[in-house]
């Protein structure tokens, strides 16, 4: 579109009752735009009949990261003036070298030299400062994934399992056993079994009648904390090839977070990391054994579903799945707690929505495009203290709006200079 002479852009938002899409109307002439061409921007999101009218040089859009067309509001133009051309230059130089984990590894030495050259106040793309990406896809979560017995998820499973079993057996009465008929209800039947026996029953029924007989992705296994291995005590071979079943062989599993927790969440999930399972996951054509170089590393993660605000949190030493986007800091000048603060600021959510991706997902390649300001030692100290405070508040269930306001003011004014 921007290769043509753009006359106007009319942002109509979503004028339809049923269709869940935002729309806009544009007018362009099919010829090369003049350097001084001005574009009329009309924002009709609040009032289609009397839209807000603004004017912007077409060259602004051409000189913006991804050549994105944005509303030329006072704030957006201030962001453009400070960072537009800088970030575009960084994107043009580095994107082909950081757009995948393989590219980052291929250009490792050049990236290390670049990181070493950074100084406070410099702008860098997050993808130049971190590694990581998507994680494991098992193709059969019910078989491999369990829920810790002390979590709310475990109680949900205890309630849902009898109904799932009853619904399946109503459809497949030949699967009803004599043992089941001895009990007045499937609730009573399941209560007579140990967790290991319930897991074996559900696994067996799935093997006989199909992977999704209880619903796609349904989790039915519950494990006690004593069944979860101490990650710090695992050998490199156990991390890479699995654990003997004579020992606790479940390990923490970060499966994404539908609730959208910020700062911290102790994952309620665990994956059966036995030697047999790991061997199968590595060879199963339906599974995706990806991101394995980052398994059992602390880092940062978020769910790929973005509900208005980005929600980033500390990732404990675990296996992470395909829905849990994970990054790992590799630059001492820009540590993870600082990145955590920047991503959790309201400004970065606004920046992503305006300049990077305004859909409802926030993928790893969106994160790699974020501009990060290299902090001073004082700024770094402030963010470390604030992140620790926010994490403690999260663990205690006492999140504070004052902490978020303090964070937003600091990131917007002190870090990005948008006073």
Task: Indicate residue ranges for each PLM-predicted region.
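Signature of N6-adenine DNA methyltransferases within the class I
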Residues: 1-234, 239, 280-282, 317-324, ...
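Generic beta-strand/beta-sheet core signal
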Residues: 11-12, 28-29, 303-305, 373-375, ...
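Short, glycine/acidic-rich hinge or "gate" loops at secondary-structure transitions
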Residues: 18, 354-355, 359, 398-405
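Structured core elements
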Residues: 25-27, 253, 272, 301, ...
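Non-catalytic DNA-recognition/assembly elements of restriction-modification systems
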Residues: 90-91, 95, 102, 115-131, ...
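Short coil/turn segments at secondary-structure boundaries
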Residues: 140-145, 266-269, 353-358, 419
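Flexible, glycine/threonine-enriched loop-and-boundary segments that flank and lead into catalytic domains
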Residues: 203-317
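Basic, amphipathic alpha-helical recognition segments used for DNA target recognition
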Residues: 293, 303-371, 376-381, 385-389, ...
